[in-house]
Amino acid sequence: MFQNADEAKKLIADEDVKFIDVRFCDLPGVMQHFTIPASAFDPAEELAFDGSSIRGFQAIHESDMAVRADLSTARVDPFRRDKTVNINFFIHDPITGEQYSRDPRNVAKKAEAYLASTGIGDTGYFGPEAEFYVFDSVRLANSATESFYHIDSEAGAWNTGALENNRGYKVRYKGGYFPVPPVDHFADLRAQISLELDRAGLQVERHDHEVGTAGQAEINYKFNTLLAAADDLQLFKYIVKNVAWQNGKTATFMPKPIFGDNGSGMHVHQSLWTGGQALFYDEAGYAGLSDTARYYMGGILKHAPSLLAFTNPTVNSYHRLVPGFEAPVNLVYSQRNRSAAMRIPITGSNPKAKRVEFRAPDSSGNPYLAFSALLLAGLDGIKNKIEPAEPIDKDLYELAPEEHAGVPQVPTSLPAVLDRLEADHEFLLAGDVFTPDLIETWIDYKRTNEIAPLQLRPHPYEYEQYYDV
């Protein structure tokens, strides 16, 4: 919104803005904020906060951190009562003035600079497609004496026998793709979200009900450069959740909220450009792909087992990545084939539209780190001319066992991908984009705060299985 500090001050005064919402991203990927009066905001000044209270940041004995405004990200918040402008900030060390190596937005900024320094290209475009579910309610409890979750949705397949306010038109399990209303209960909600996205500067291309029951949805908007695309995704999630909340609903981007139905993924479309020219198109190549694009895919497929530590970084991610629910578990590439982890969309002969789509990711993690890791893996493939295995255009779910045995698969758990990241992360250190400290912190955080607590707790299904042993 703002190009410089003077422009920011003028607009804040002219538009009678009351508050500035200071936003930055924690290490796991959740946006944080604090709010200051607009009258106290000086775009040129740093603001301080306690880094020891932010997940994945500082220890208590070195907790002071500072943020500096990225004025290009300023947006009026449509959900606040008093006029508020949200601005994303970069994090700095207040003593040295250096950019903080664990600041996810700084990682994305360094990734873009590294791309330009390689001479391969000057711009990377990323287009995530984040699916989500819409529920009426969610209840959960975890204590020493109880553990459960309960979700409900007026459109849920499990509510066909509900006694009250049941007018039918429930969405069957794995049967939600493209039905018209009244089976599609949430067309108006998605339309309202789409209008808010457009007002926020995200150009919506389409919205639809996805395959899952209970309001699973997808809203696609225009791609962007790496850092901006990650900012856009955080803004997208903020708008989706708040519009749902305003309508008495609750939205979740959890990868697998419903057992027995499709999970929610985040397919990521990617392309490289230089001097305004697309680098991924060659009409003579398979599916119209250039050598550069093929090597880029080769890098991602080679490093995928460690990449998933950033693109699929939760325990719940691996409940989605199982055969039978349209999940891309096969580490191969193909034209059109949605059972492959890497797909080349049909885009005709337009070089500018040629891109590759990595289908494994979900949106439970940190988009700044995920997109940066994907770019670095792809660039490693280009620099080292990593050839992917031959494309497979068959339905990979229907291969004979002997054929399927030769197809590489994604790892099946978060501990497995963290082990792979520990062994394979040199490509992430290029250009000092990721630091060894960041990678070590990420692995330790996931093991300590997400894996270990689950290992300590009995699961409700264990009672069903083992109570009467």
Curated annotation (Swiss-Prot):
Cofactor note text: Binds 2 Mg(2+) ions per subunit.
Family to which this protein belongs: Belongs to the glutamine synthetase family.
Binding-site residues, L-glutamate: 262-263, 320, 326, 338, 359
Miscellaneous remark of the record: Two forms of glutamine synthetase (GSI and GSII) can be found in this bacteria, GSI is a typical prokaryotic glutamine synthetase whereas GSII is similar to the eukaryotic enzyme.
Annotated GO biological process: glutamine biosynthetic process; nitrogen utilization
GS catalytic domain sequence ranges: 104-469
Modified residues (O-AMP-tyrosine): 397
Domain (GS beta-grasp) ranges: 15-96
SUPFAM superfamilies: Glutamine synthetase, N-terminal domain (SSF54368), Glutamine synthetase/guanido kinase (SSF55931)
Residues bound to ATP: 205, 221-223, 269-271, 338, 343, 352
Residues annotated as transmembrane: none
GO cellular component, one term: cytoplasm
MF terms (GO), sorted A to Z: ATP binding; glutamine synthetase activity; metal ion binding
The name this protein goes by in its record: Glutamine synthetase
